[in-house]
Amino acid sequence: GRFIWNDVLVALFASDVLRQHPGETIMYNLLCSKVVAETILSNHGKPFMWRTGHSFLKKKNQEVKAAFIGELSGHFFFSKDFYNHDDGLYSTLRLLRYLAETDQTMSQAVDSLPKYISSPQICVGCDDDKKVALMDKIAPVLRKDFPEAEVIDDERAGDGLRLELSKGMFVVRYSQNGPYVTVKFESKTTEGYETLRKYILELLRSYQEVDWQSDINVNVEALEK
């Protein structure tokens, strides 16, 4: 078996929803893989990215009217077909129905999507009174070091920024819920993934505000390996 990140499920659910609601908008959060937008476009839907936090997504959907909303954290909202709240059992049954109707195994469905090598969501400790200032320091460095990237740092990013690269992306943001910053990155190639991993590790190590010994750290080994 293999681990399937929740944003891959967002892409599969988007494919399913767009079969029944062609041309509709699919909303997803900042941390999701590029596979989500690419899958939406290939199924003739309209991708709409918004800041992380399911409360922010639900509020924005009062305006956007997306047919489906998905988050990396595993919140899935089938706005056109259900009651506009996330329900794990419904999502599971919905996935099983999609696989049955398209006559695919889970592996076949995942393998049909665009391929990216993606990190887990990485959380690194940073005190609440320092994390906003840390992002203010990091942002100009990223713009300088990645002049070719599309930098998303407006209201879609909310509490951080996302760099869209030709063969990957990465996100760095401060948490709204605790004393830490979040990192997520990906690339189409192993070489590109390693380049981003090493860059992000050295970037964060250059700031004393980052607490590598914090009990709140999650998946830090994905950066340090």
Residue positions per predicted region:
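Alpha-helical metal-binding/catalytic segments enriched in His/Glu/Asp
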Residues: V10-F13, T92
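Phosphate-binding and adjacent anionic-ligand microenvironments
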Residues: R19-K225
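Short Gly/Thr/Asp-enriched flexible loops that form oxyanion-binding sites at enzyme active sites
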Residues: G1-V10, V36-A37
